[in-house]
Amino acid sequence: AAAAKNLTPVVLELGGKSPCIVDRGADIEVAARRTAWGKTLNAGQTCIAPDYLLIHRSLQDRFTETFARALQRLHGDDAQQSPHYVRLVNDRAFERVAGYLSQGRILIGGRTDAADRYIEPTLLGDVDPAWPVMQEEIFGPVLPMLPFDDTDEALAFVNAREKPLAFYWFGPEKTGNEALLRTSSGGACLNDVIMHIANDRLPFGGVGNSGMGRYHG
């Protein structure tokens, strides 16, 4: 009874690399639009931003084209002039995130302005999973894209890494529900990103190396 009076809830949120999977059967327009928004919200400086994209190999080209259009609709032809697109928080963050731009082939974006701490929304291809861009939390507007050939391969890739703070899936709902049962993450969305944190009736927190404890809900 004495201890109960002094119990204090604790939430330790540590972030991590949150995967976004785009599987066969996904609505590419929806996937590109929502991923573009979630990745460039606060210039990617959110703990639950999509940190890397796993996409079915057959969808890569179409997604890239659609993602470019989605970014243009969000931020215009020049994101640096957009009133809604923010800058990296400090010079150290700028240098760290800008360093990822050389770790893959730039498919979209890639422009920087150090004086303005500006990094254009960027999609990277031909990325090696062993490179720092795939080993460290990016916390910026750079999205590495890796192809997969079947769902089992994508889920094995996620499960071989530390448990993420968030897990995002675009594809048929049935397959997505199965993916949730086969992975572990702090939170998750099917055919959306970020939005699970907006509902104060849902618990939020991490698991494993992405944190412990829950709040809301």
List where the protein language model places each region:
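Conserved C-terminal structural/oligomerization subdomain of aldehyde/semialdehyde dehydrogenase
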Residues: 21, 72, 118-217
